[in-house]
Amino acid sequence: MKLDLLTAISPIDGRYRGKTEPLADYFSEYALIRYRVRVEIEYFITLCELPLPQLKNFDHALFDTLRGIYLNFNEENAQRVKDIEKVTNHDVKAVEYFIKEEFDKIVGLDAYKEFIHFGLTSQDINNTSVPLSIKEALEQTYYPLIEELIAQLQQYADEWKDVPMLAKTHGQPASPTRLGKEIMVYVYRLTEQLRQLKECRMTAKFGGATGNYNAHHVAYPQYDWKEFGNRFVSEKLGLEREQYTTQISNYDCLGSVFDAMRRINTIIIDLDRDFWMYISMDYFKQKIKAGEVGSSAMPHKVNPIDFENSEGNLGIANAVLQFLAMKLPVSRLQRDLTDSTVLRNVGVPFGHGMIAMQSTLKGLRKLILHDEKIEEDLNNTWAVVAEAIQTILRREAYPHPYEALKALTRTNKKMSEETIHEFVQTLNVSDAVKAELMAITPHNYTGI
């Protein structure tokens, strides 16, 4: 069966491919190979810049030509690497052999080919390529999308900042709030967690077979290979080298990244559920698109499917992110291979997260504020001003104010404006205080 959108096992590459296409540049097999080629080429160039004695005569004018190997890397090149891998049964060695083939196409480079992948182990390439792909995926796809979501929420918060709304705690009426402020809660939370995500250090392992630069040092003991590695990883890759490692990355900093992403996802799940509830409460209507069907049986249905889709995808993303954060830092002795297959799945939570954020945005942009229903609920719930009244009575040293309001409002009888005002008139307080109390309504008792 040919692989296409209909035959793909994962919905990320099937049903939702249109939403996740940009991630292929960072997390596909093709992308991983390209990143590996990039790291190998930049490493070779850095050895030339050192220079190693055998590379001192390498023509620096050829650096752009070498960088062209990964800048112009295409699917045909990636397939060549896969063909080589069928023989080597080793993915990183296949990349090395591919680069050597590319060197053969450039006159005069034959003498330098053995300095491709010089002194390195596969994880020096993988544990730089993967964090680099994550870093660039965050910067070029994830951050812009989450910032677009925050901007949409900010727009609604500004637009509805003066709309009073009945709050619900424990599912029951509570002191009124403002719709714009409730949306600002999510703007604040997402902005703060995005800041923390951006502050996560993006680190890489680069130190030879067991993290000690054994091969480098035995061949060229005159060089400070730790300083070389620090400079290469920082200046050429924009990452930070982990100073003490086994054969593989410690993955602690990647764990921080995944945990930060999970917190952001959890906030969006909370947002999805809240707007789902607001729609259920009829505080929002949804824009209807001609031709769409909400139910195969019930023609009237207009369901909050975008928020539900988002919630489901974020649940999957969080499960994988939690596993990645817990599993990757654990490896037997100086290394086992379990991280290898796990690392190939780092794009999965990105994919589900990208699907989710686009769905949340779509759901938000369908919203139509139903002012009448919000106002109706406020008008029908005068009991919520009890807090205001008892607080002012406390200020006035009125005896047992809380208990008085509790006796009035904690019944199964509906509290109306008339009921509240009649109660106020019975209070032994000044006319000025009575007027102050009478002026309080569910519409204006919204705090600051």
Describe the residue ranges of each PLM region.
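Glycine-rich anion/phosphate-binding loop at the beta-strand->alpha-helix junction
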Residues: Q193, E240-E242, T246-R332
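Alpha-helical coiled-coil oligomerization motifs
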Residues: D158-K161, M202, W276, Y283, ...
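Active-site-adjacent "gating/activation" loops or surface patches in catalytic cores
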Residues: Y223-Q247, Y251
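Short, well-ordered beta-strand elements within core beta-sheets of diverse protein domains
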Residues: K181, G255-R263, A388-R395
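A helix-coil-helix interface module used to build multimeric assemblies
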Residues: M1-Y213, Y220, D224-F232, G294, ...
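Amphipathic alpha-helical coiled-coil segments and their boundaries
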Residues: I134-K135, Y142, I183, N250, ...
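Amphipathic alpha-helices that form helix-helix packing interfaces
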Residues: Y43-T46, E102, L149, L153-Y156, ...
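Catalytic-core signal marking the mid-to-C-terminal active-site face
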Residues: K2-E29, D64, V293-I448
